Amino acid sequence: MVEKTIEIKQGQVLSDILPNKEIPTNTILNKTLTGCGATYGEIVHAKRHSIIIEPNVPVILGKKAEHPSLFAVYEGITKEDVKAFLAGEEDGFRKIITTPEGFDKKVLPAMYETHTPMYDDYFLLLDECEKTIQDVGYRGDIYLPVEDFFRFKNKAMVSATPILPSD
């Protein structure tokens, strides 16, 4: 694993300093600070289709309120809703935000059924990635996206408190 340190000055956000304003692919981003714009940059600046996985619905609802074009998947949103979004007119880059469970039960099946080449065409951002390990004991399905994570050509994990991989 190659480590690279990037300093953010007061008043800056990640998209101010990252190349092309995007989180690089195949990255574990240890941002050390919350609220420095990792998901904001992916939603607003990244010129690519994105699936953002958040561990909790309140975060998803907050992001949706800030960014109305973001397609939010949570309880009450169905696989058919996801398919309709994917079949709809595309005006720019598609941005989907979902829980781990929504990814597995709604987003993945909708992508398969619409023959959307998600592993090649979408960037997968696993936000608060430490929650996958911390919460799996009582929330077994939180781990499901990890099985698909490495199938994506373009992907990253983000956390202010990551649990780094070890041998």
In which residue ranges do the predicted regions lie?
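Inter-Walker segment of RecA-like/P-loop motor cores
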Residues: P68-E113
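Helicase motor interdomain insertion/brace
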Residues: T32-T39, G140-Y143, S159
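SF2 helicase catalytic motif II
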Residues: P100-F103, M111-A156
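Pre-Walker A (Motif I) flank of P-loop NTPase domains
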Residues: E22-N30, R48-H49, R94, N154
